[in-house]
């Protein structure tokens, strides 16, 4: 391990910066990546020792150097990895390679742009065996350091499909046997007691606006998650990541 002061590195091209213990650990375990450099604070020496075989260069920084480069340890936990991204399948490639008889669930997120929410949803996807997240690429965030950290390693295994047209992608998936369930709190929604099909798309809109009408019309069923609403304090809706987790659990146990 070297203690030479490194140059500040940024995400360029296929080079990615990942920080946080869980996100970095998962990336280091991903054999599809080619890792370039690990920057750690002195108190993370033991963490680095466990992954010496996976990384070309490990640089130990004192607190002052690390803070100058990365702004302190609060968000990074004193662990920053510079790594090459790996090739991810397109939605079309995924569907064509999928076994038609396999049980499969995908999430479609309409105009959900917050990396923290998407990272949290991705983590739930990993835990409930969801195959991937679909978003329109014109408003979907890149795989940023904050998204990787929020996903706690799940970004290494959950597909991230950025498509040109979300409505069209849902329509195309239905040709492969998928059934689209839109989750919405409107009065015309059905209760959440449903029988999922073997291949399902769970569709969610943004917390403020919900699904756009054109996406909603593409759904085969509109579902409402049953819950107690506190009208007095105006607590009447779930965070989208929580709603997605509930929906994934319902599919998982079906």
Regions found by a protein language model. Name each.
Residues 181-237:
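Active-site/ligand-binding-proximal alpha/beta "capping" segment
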Residues 47, 140-146, 209-218:
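Short, glycine/polar-rich helix-capping loops at beta-to-alpha or helix-loop-helix junctions
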Residues 92, 96-187:
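RNA substrate-binding interface of SAM-dependent RNA methyltransferases
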Residues 43, 63-66, 138-140, 207-209, ...:
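Short, acidic/turn-prone active-site loops that include or flank metal/cofactor-
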Residues 25, 30, 126-127, 148-152, ...:
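Structured adenosyl-cofactor binding patch, chiefly the S-adenosyl-L-methionine
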Residues 1-99:
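N-terminal positively charged helical leader segments and presequences
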């Amino acid at each position: 391990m070297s203690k030479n002061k490194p140059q500040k590195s940024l995400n360029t091209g296929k080079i990615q910066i990942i920080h946080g213990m869980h996100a970095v650990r998962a990336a280091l375990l991903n054999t599809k990546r080619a890792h370039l450099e690990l920057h750690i604070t002195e108190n993370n020496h033991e963490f680095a020792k466990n992954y010496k075989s996976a990384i070309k260069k490990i640089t130990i920084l004192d607190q002052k150097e690390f803070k100058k480069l990365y702004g302190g340890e609060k968000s990074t936990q004193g662990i920053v990895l510079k790594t090459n991204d790996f090739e991810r399948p397109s939605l079309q490639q995924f569907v064509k390679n999928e076994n038609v008889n396999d049980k499969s669930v995908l999430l479609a997120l309409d105009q959900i742009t917050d990396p923290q929410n998407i990272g949290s949803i991705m983590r739930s996807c990993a835990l409930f065996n969801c195959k991937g997240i679909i978003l329109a690429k014109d408003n979907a965030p890149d795989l940023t350091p904050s998204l990787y950290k929020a996903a706690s390693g799940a970004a290494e295994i959950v597909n991230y499909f950025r498509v040109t047209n979300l409505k069209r992608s849902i329509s195309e998936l239905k040709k492969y046997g998928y059934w689209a369930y839109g989750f919405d709190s409107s009065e015309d929604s059905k209760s959440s007691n449903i029988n999922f099909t073997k291949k399902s798309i769970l569709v969610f809109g943004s917390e403020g606006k919900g699904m756009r009408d054109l996406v909603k019309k593409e759904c085969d069923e509109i579902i409402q998650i049953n819950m107690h609403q506190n009208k007095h304090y105006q607590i009447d809706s779930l965070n989208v990541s929580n709603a997605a987790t509930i929906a994934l659990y319902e599919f998982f146990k079906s």
